[in-house]
Amino acid sequence: KLSNKKIQIKKSKIFFKESNSTKDVVVLSTISKSSLFYDKKVNANKVNIEGSIYNTKYNLSLLRNTNKKNTTDDLLIKLKKLNAIIKNEFVSDENKKNSYSGKASINFSGSEINTIYRKDDKLIKLNSEKSRLNNYSFDFKGEIITSPFYYNLVVNLEVINVVKMIESLSKLKNLVDKKILLNPNLNGKITFNINSLKGIKFFDGAKIDLKVINGKLILSNSTLTSYKIGKMFFTDSVLESVDNKKIFKSKILFKISNQKKFYQKLLISRPYRIKLNNVYFEIEKDLNNNEVEIKKIILNKKIVDNSSNKSIDLSNLIDVNEIKELKNWIELKKYSNQIFFKISKLN
């Protein structure tokens, strides 16, 4: 129980460390101002904080009710730059040390994530409840180990709008810029199973395998699937900090199972069509600007199946600036025809 008199703290810092004093600092929060006091009206301790974490400003309110048999806590955090609100309600288990259960919710950019969880010692088990992402429902479950910190989550989405998702991710870009996702102390894995993709012409479903390991965000083993045409595989796909720049590199192989459907989708003229098993890309992007560098583009790259189809390197034939200027699906199909026309002249 706190004092009835309000305690104020200004211009301070909070260091979060693992219980072992030899461990590095996990989180550093700067406090602009805060107040701590006991509220007689609701018989609860109250804490209000204005501060920043990883250079992201936040407002935090904590209410601890001391009137009940089991201590209950209500937590509210507002992250201004992210336009996000985090709420958490949990009840401590007085019969078991370091154990409690609760419900958490995160609201951002028209999305709502609700979680039911249970913590026993260092293990947290969680499940979703009536959650939505860009107005589409989804579910998830997983575990979090608090020391050493590691999470493993599986998220199942029936539908996702790719355009809206990209817009939302652009708002969350500073999660990467401020070393939240790339924090070497926050390791874990999230697998996204997406049954249906909206707002994208070529692919129907996806599996995104996202790992964060030692300050690197790894997307290897992720796939995009076209049920009628083939599957795109991401290998050696990593986002990391290099010389204070956030660089994404990826090797991508699009295996084509139905050449006829592929060419029909892009409306490639019959005289320009070649025998095509796959398309291979190597790309690099600096997240601080809009520059994308295509390192390689190869048609019919030699892989395990040892296809006899001729490999064609398009790395010097493709102009990245021309690709950037494509505004819609119609322009993409027109540009693809131009490329396959040039390829037909090479054979």
Short names for language-model regions:
Residues K1-N347:
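Membrane-proximal interfacial segments on either side of biological membranes
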